[in-house]
Structure formats: structure tokens, C-alpha cells
Amino acid sequence: MPVALPVTLYPDEPMARHSSWRAGGTARYYAEPATPDEAIALAAWAREQQLPLIWIGRGTNLLVRDEGFDGVIASYRGQRWELIEHGETAEVWIEAGAPMAGTARRLAAMGWAGLEWAEGLPGAVGGAIVGNAGCYGGSVAEVLITADLLLNGSECVEWSVHDLAYTYRESVLKQLLHTGIPPLVLAGRFRLQRGDPAALTARMKAIAAERKQKTPAGSSCGSVFKNPAGDFAGRLIEAAGLKGVRIGDAEISTLHANYIINRGQARAADILALIDLARTKVADQFGITLQLEVRII
């Protein structure tokens, strides 16, 4: 019996609409489930149609190759959250589709500390959990308690932060992104402490100002490469003489060399060519192999 779909499917969807790079090919089907039941139904439909299924966040570190993806790409959009107070501490349960920075701001305004480092962090909670997002002295691994997951497109489970095996910008979830129907993060439960709303808000405003000053203008997916141990990817790329190098409409930023900017109509191939160039030059000159922080489909 065919699976009834409670979620809208968008055929031949240009994924440039869903990537901060504003570049990339099409997905055969694109969907935005907003509940676990919708995600389960979508996974069942994809299995029935014998189509590969990939879960994504908000596309802030995503590039789909120009030839596109012959399957289903889905972005989970549930955004509910619930705060459970325990005197001077609290736990907040946040669905994966909620914006990381916006949620952190709301909690700070309520006097809850723990996520203020996420000010200006692009993307949603789910992607942050998968990639152990971090900046300005904080990271997901330090405050996450548990994650609610959908495994094999059918089984809802809860994993502890230890189960996720976090390292720098890595998790076991990230390693499983390309295996069968990959795990989907449905929600995360985070640890908070009571703080002064004015002080927390002031800190977040300072972080936002610093981030704005350091972030190149234009369409990008943020840091392209992870920082190697004891060094910075941007410094190495700059030292290799690649600042400002352009292929098509893709450019290695003159402000921060670990950013690749779409200056107009860049193709995924242009961005990938700059990625390969940076990797090759840095490896040749410094003997360091840069590892991607962005996700290529």
C-alpha cells in the first residue's frame, strides 16, 4: 500500500535557495518536515520509492554539486522549545529546526546563561548538534545533555552527549551522514545556569559586533576548513598567497581567507575548484592537509 505523505514535496528544487552560498544544483525532491511523524512518513516514502534521503539543517554550511542530487533532501523545521527550571540551574529542550542564535538570545533575555556564545552562529540547533558547533569560548559539547534522534527513518531514541563522541567540529552523527538513511536530530536538551539578563545581553551584543567586524560580506558558508591543531586555516591559506584569488564568481575572501564568497553567479564547481586549490597549495607549502568544515553533497 503506498505511503501517504503529510509533508509537501518540491520536485527539482534548486538547492541554491537553501544554501548560504546561494549556489549549487537541484534536488530531485525537497521537503521540510516539522514533526517526527512527518519525518518518519517522508523516510518511509523515500524507502518505498528507492530514493536516497539526506537530512540537512538550514544550509548554512552546505553545497550541493552542480549535477544535483537524485534523491530527497529534507530540512527538519520543528521549532518548539521547553524550559525546565531547577532553582539556579535549568534544562532547555529545543527542537532541531529552531535558530541557534535566536534561541540563545531569548534565553539570555530571560536570565539563563549557557548558550550566549552562540550569538551570530548561523543555522539551526540540529546542525549545531551534528557538527559540535562552537565559537567565542563555547561549544555544543560543553552544554548538551541529550539529543533526540530518528534512526533509520523509523525509531525515535535518546542519546547522551557521551554517545555522540564529540571532538573538534565532529561527532558520530557527522560520520553517519552518508550511510543509508542517516540519523536525524529531532531535538536537544541543554544545561543552563541562572545569570544576569543585562550582563548576558551585553556580552551577546559584544560578540555580535566582533563577529560582524570579522565576517566578510557576501554569500558564504562561513569557515570552509577546520582549523588544524595549533594553527588557523585562514592563516595558512593567506600565507599560501591565495587571498583574493577568484574562479568564476567564487572568491577567497580578502578579509578572511577561510571564507569563500559568491560574488554573483558562482557555480558549485567554482567553489569546489577554490577548495581544491587551497588544499593543494597549503599541503604543498606547509605539509598540512586541510579538512572540510562544510558539507558537500
Swiss-Prot record:
<keyword id="KW-0573">Peptidoglycan synthesis</keyword>
<keyword id="KW-0521">NADP</keyword>
<keyword id="KW-0560">Oxidoreductase</keyword>
<protein>
    <recommendedName>
        <fullName>UDP-N-acetylenolpyruvoylglucosamine reductase</fullName>
        <ecNumber>1.3.1.98</ecNumber>
    </recommendedName>
</protein>
<feature type="active site">
    <location>
        <position position="293"/>
    </location>
</feature>
<dbReference type="InterPro" id="IPR011601">
    <property type="entry name" value="MurB_C"/>
</dbReference>
<feature type="active site" description="Proton donor">
    <location>
        <position position="223"/>
    </location>
</feature>
<dbReference type="GO" id="GO:0005829">
    <property type="term" value="C:cytosol"/>
</dbReference>
<comment type="pathway">
    <text>Cell wall biogenesis; peptidoglycan biosynthesis.</text>
</comment>
<dbReference type="Pfam" id="PF02873">
    <property type="entry name" value="MurB_C"/>
</dbReference>
<dbReference type="GO" id="GO:0008762">
    <property type="term" value="F:UDP-N-acetylmuramate dehydrogenase activity"/>
</dbReference>
<dbReference type="InterPro" id="IPR036318">
    <property type="entry name" value="FAD-bd_PCMH-like_sf"/>
</dbReference>
<dbReference type="GO" id="GO:0009252">
    <property type="term" value="P:peptidoglycan biosynthetic process"/>
</dbReference>
<keyword id="KW-0132">Cell division</keyword>
<keyword id="KW-0961">Cell wall biogenesis/degradation</keyword>
<dbReference type="InterPro" id="IPR016166">
    <property type="entry name" value="FAD-bd_PCMH"/>
</dbReference>
<comment type="similarity">
    <text>Belongs to the MurB family.</text>
</comment>
<dbReference type="GO" id="GO:0071555">
    <property type="term" value="P:cell wall organization"/>
</dbReference>
<dbReference type="GO" id="GO:0051301">
    <property type="term" value="P:cell division"/>
</dbReference>
<keyword id="KW-0133">Cell shape</keyword>
<feature type="domain" description="FAD-binding PCMH-type">
    <location>
        <begin position="22"/>
        <end position="195"/>
    </location>
</feature>
<dbReference type="InterPro" id="IPR003170">
    <property type="entry name" value="MurB"/>
</dbReference>
<dbReference type="GO" id="GO:0050660">
    <property type="term" value="F:flavin adenine dinucleotide binding"/>
</dbReference>
<dbReference type="InterPro" id="IPR036635">
    <property type="entry name" value="MurB_C_sf"/>
</dbReference>
<keyword id="KW-0274">FAD</keyword>
<dbReference type="GO" id="GO:0008360">
    <property type="term" value="P:regulation of cell shape"/>
</dbReference>
<keyword id="KW-0963">Cytoplasm</keyword>
<dbReference type="GO" id="GO:0071949">
    <property type="term" value="F:FAD binding"/>
</dbReference>
<dbReference type="InterPro" id="IPR016169">
    <property type="entry name" value="FAD-bd_PCMH_sub2"/>
</dbReference>
<feature type="active site">
    <location>
        <position position="169"/>
    </location>
</feature>
<keyword id="KW-0131">Cell cycle</keyword>
<dbReference type="InterPro" id="IPR006094">
    <property type="entry name" value="Oxid_FAD_bind_N"/>
</dbReference>
<keyword id="KW-0285">Flavoprotein</keyword>
<dbReference type="Pfam" id="PF01565">
    <property type="entry name" value="FAD_binding_4"/>
</dbReference>
<dbReference type="InterPro" id="IPR016167">
    <property type="entry name" value="FAD-bd_PCMH_sub1"/>
</dbReference>
<comment type="function">
    <text>Cell wall formation.</text>
</comment>
